[in-house]
Structures are given as C-alpha cells and as structure tokens.
C-alpha cells in the first residue's frame, strides 16, 4: 500500500498543472438492477467539516462498478458509526445483506486515518466481512476511499477491485498553441493531469504493465512517431519513426516487448520491439494491412486486425513464428480488439449494417454479444479485472468517453466540457 502511494505521489508531484475541465461519470443505465448495498457516511472525528466525503466516494465506486446499487442516504434506515451500532434487521428489511461503515480521524501531524468495516447483515448478522485502516495525507484521501472500495468489492464478488486504476486519453481542445493533450485521470475522472501537450495530433496511448510509462503516437515532427514517456520524470524515448505510418503501440503483459504497426514497406504490418535491446522483429508480412495489435496474457501471441479476407477481421498469431488464425466470424467486420487479462475473452468494434458498436467475444465458445447502442464507437479498452470497458463514441458534434459493463447491463458516460475526447486506455492495477 505504501509503495503504491509513493509511486502515484511521484506522478502527482511532476504534473502539478491539473487540467481545469475534468470528466465525471454519469450513469445512464443499469444501476437499478444491481445488488443493493448500504454505505453509511463515515464518522468524522475532527473539527468543522470533513475534507472529503469518504462514504460518498465508496458508494460511487460500488455504483460505478455496475454490480451494486447503494441505497440513497435519505433512505438509510440508520446511520451507524461503528460495527456495534449496525442493526442487521433494519437493513435486511430493505433487501440489503451488507453495509459499509467507517471513520475518519485527523492526526496532529496533518495526516488522516481512514478506517472502514464491511458488515454482514444477513448470513452471519453483525459479522465483519472485511476491514482495514489507512493513514494518509489530505491529497490521498480519495485513494484511501478507493482502497476501501476495492477491498469491499473483492470480498463481496471474489473479483479484484479496479477503483485505484487510471485512464489515459487524448483531448483535442478548441484553438490554442497546443490543441492536443494526452491526459491521465483516476478511473472516475478525478485528479486529472496533462502528460503531454502538442500542436499536432496525439493518438493511441498504451500503458506499460507496471503503470509507470505510456506509449503513444505523436505527429510533432511532421510525421508519425512512436514514443514511450515515463510518468515519474516526463522523459520521452522515441522508439519508431520510420517512413509512412508508425502506430498502434501495445506493451506485452510481461513488460519486455512493444508491439506496433508500421507501413515502411508499403502495407501495414505488425512488428515487435524488444524494449531492452531495441531490436525490432517483423511478425506479419503481406500485401494486406495488419494493425491494432493486442497481447494475450502469455506475452507470446497477439490478436490484431487484418483485411486479408477483404474486410477487417481479427486474427491471432505467435510472435515467434507460425500461421495466423482468424478468430472473428460474426459481423461484416471486426477490429480494434482488447484481450482480457485471463485470455478467455476480448472486446472489439463490430460493424453490422453500417453501425459500429462495442462487442464482446468469448474466445472459448466463440459467442459474441453486442454491448453498446451508442454511435460510431471506437477504441475499446478493458478494465484490468475484465468487468468494464471504456471507449469513445460520437455524441452531437464531438467525441466523448463511455463506459459499459462486459455483460452489457450497466452503462455510463464521462463527458468533458473543453474538447473532444478520444483513444481511452485503462491502466493496469496500480
């Protein structure tokens, strides 16, 4: 926990200029069918008002997961401040089988101790299912709340929580010297900061598996180039600037390789670079176009988009040789895949009758499920726990970020007010 705080703190210290117009999650569908839960306002043991509404953040996290529906505060049957004060029968009468209570204690040194308890109200009434406490400074109160959310979520679902993750995305603002910005924020849009500003387009950010670096495409030199930027110090390393197109970077899960697409020989092909040595190997070779690589968890094989069958479809190939295998067969065309961390499924953009939507394919059975009904969906990116997808879509005259659960039931959007938002990429666990 302390190590995670230090890593993230180094990032915040570098990027002190926070962008003014932050994105925020607005739920549009699905929360009413989720599992009800109680999240009580955390007891504040200090003078005046609490510096953060920790209970509100935990409730928002659980609601944003699409799996829980925290009861409105106005409907809380009681507001216990400790485990001993929880009256299980009052909660089970509302169909609630678990309650989160907590406390925030200010310290003389300027720190805060955030404590929480997840209490069973049904199976073993009054039993503590999970609990923890975090001593943090003021700027880390939201992180402490996300930590409580992660632990509660995992205890109740057996799925690792992803509330301490971040998203990277590109914002195109209106006018100014640097209209293109690569930004990073918490998964819920808070604590947004600018990683890089450019007078020319930025595209396709991709996270390193340890969350310390972001690869992306820049056109600042007048042509496309692939770079890797270290978040802690801002250092930028150029890794590819060949003739024609350099694009679609993707880190291998083990962090040793970077896959990308180059068109230096005419058509687009997939290449893989050993990050340590800089050696580049060509993976695909043909007159057709192959692009948008994404890794399987073994770091030895890739899914990618190719038009070798006439229209874009998704294929799988080993990075050490072998024949490519087509893995999408439903829909007029499929592209821009992101493989889940367990390798059992992927999300992609599927086009039928001229409409392109986010779809999920089970890689074991081949079954495909359409997840969205928004317009001109692009660049889906999975949360590291595989429960949610972030993507961009066209809304009105611009592009915005959207969220959808991988079962298609929960939907939300993250509107921004200062430009078009594209190319979202969900971070690994941080």
UniProtKB/Swiss-Prot annotation:
Pfam families: PD40, TolB_N. Residues 1-21 form the signal peptide. One of its GO terms (biological process) is protein import. Gene3D superfamilies: TolB, C-terminal domain, TolB, N-terminal domain. GO terms for cellular component: periplasmic space. It is found in: Periplasm. Keywords: Cell cycle, Cell division, Periplasm, Signal. Belongs to the TolB family. Part of the Tol-Pal system, which plays a role in outer membrane invagination during cell division and is important for maintaining outer membrane integrity. TolB occupies a key intermediary position in the Tol-Pal system because it communicates directly with both membrane-embedded components, Pal in the outer membrane and TolA in the inner membrane. The Tol-Pal system is composed of five core proteins: the inner membrane proteins TolA, TolQ and TolR, the periplasmic protein TolB and the outer membrane protein Pal. They form a network linking the inner and outer membranes and the peptidoglycan layer. This is Tol-Pal system protein TolB.
């Amino acid at each position: 926990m302390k190590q995670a705080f230090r890593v993230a703190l180094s990032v915040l210290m570098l990027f002190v200029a926070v962008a003014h117009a932050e994105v925020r999650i607005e739920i549009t569908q699905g929360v009413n069918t989720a599992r009800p839960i109680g999240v009580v306002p955390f007891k504040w043991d200090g003078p005046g008002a609490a510096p953060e509404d920790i209970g509100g953040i935990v409730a928002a996290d659980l609601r944003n997961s699409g799996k829980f529906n925290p009861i409105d505060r106005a409907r809380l049957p009681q507001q216990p401040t400790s485990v001993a004060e929880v009256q299980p029968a009052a909660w089970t009468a509302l169909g609630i089988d678990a309650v989160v209570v907590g406390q925030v204690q200010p310290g003389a040194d300027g720190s805060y101790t955030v404590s929480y308890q997840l209490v069973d109200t049904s199976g073993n009434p009054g039993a503590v299912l999970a609990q923890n406490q975090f001593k943090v400074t003021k700027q880390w109160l939201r992180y402490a709340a996300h930590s409580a959310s992660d632990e509660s979520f995992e205890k109740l679902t057996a799925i690792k929580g992803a509330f301490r993750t971040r998203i990277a995305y590109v914002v195109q603002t209106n006018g100014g010297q640097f209209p293109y910005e690569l930004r990073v924020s918490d998964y819920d849009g808070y604590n947004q900061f600018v990683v890089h500003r450019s007078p020319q387009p930025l595209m396709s950010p991709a996270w390193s598996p340890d969350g310390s670096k972001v690869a992306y495409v820049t056109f600042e030199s007048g042509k496309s180039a692939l770079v890797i930027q270290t978040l802690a110090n801002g250092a930028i390393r150029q890794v590819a600037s060949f003739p024609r197109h350099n694009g679609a970077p993707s880190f291998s899960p083990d962090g040793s390789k970077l896959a990308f697409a180059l068109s230096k020989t005419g058509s687009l092909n997939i290449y893989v670079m050993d990050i340590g040595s800089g050696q580049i190997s060509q993976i695909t070779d043909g007159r057709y176009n192959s692009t948008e690589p994404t890794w399987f968890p073994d770091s030895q094989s890739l899914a990618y988009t190719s038009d070798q069958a006439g229209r874009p479809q998704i294929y799988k190939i080993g990075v050490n040789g072998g024949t490519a295998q087509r893995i999408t067969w439903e829909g007029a065309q499929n592209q821009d895949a992101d493989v889940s961390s367990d390798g059992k499924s992927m999300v992609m953009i599927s086009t039928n009758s001229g409409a392109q939507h986010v779809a999920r394919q089970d890689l074991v059975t081949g079954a495909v499920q359409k997840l969205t009904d928004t317009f001109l969906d692009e660049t889906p990116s999975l949360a590291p726990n595989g429960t949610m997808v972030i993507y961009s879509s066209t809304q009105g005259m611009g592009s915005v970020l959207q969220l959808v659960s991988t079962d298609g039931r929960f939907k939300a959007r993250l509107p921004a007010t200062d430009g078009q938002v594209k190319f979202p990429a969900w971070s690994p666990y941080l």
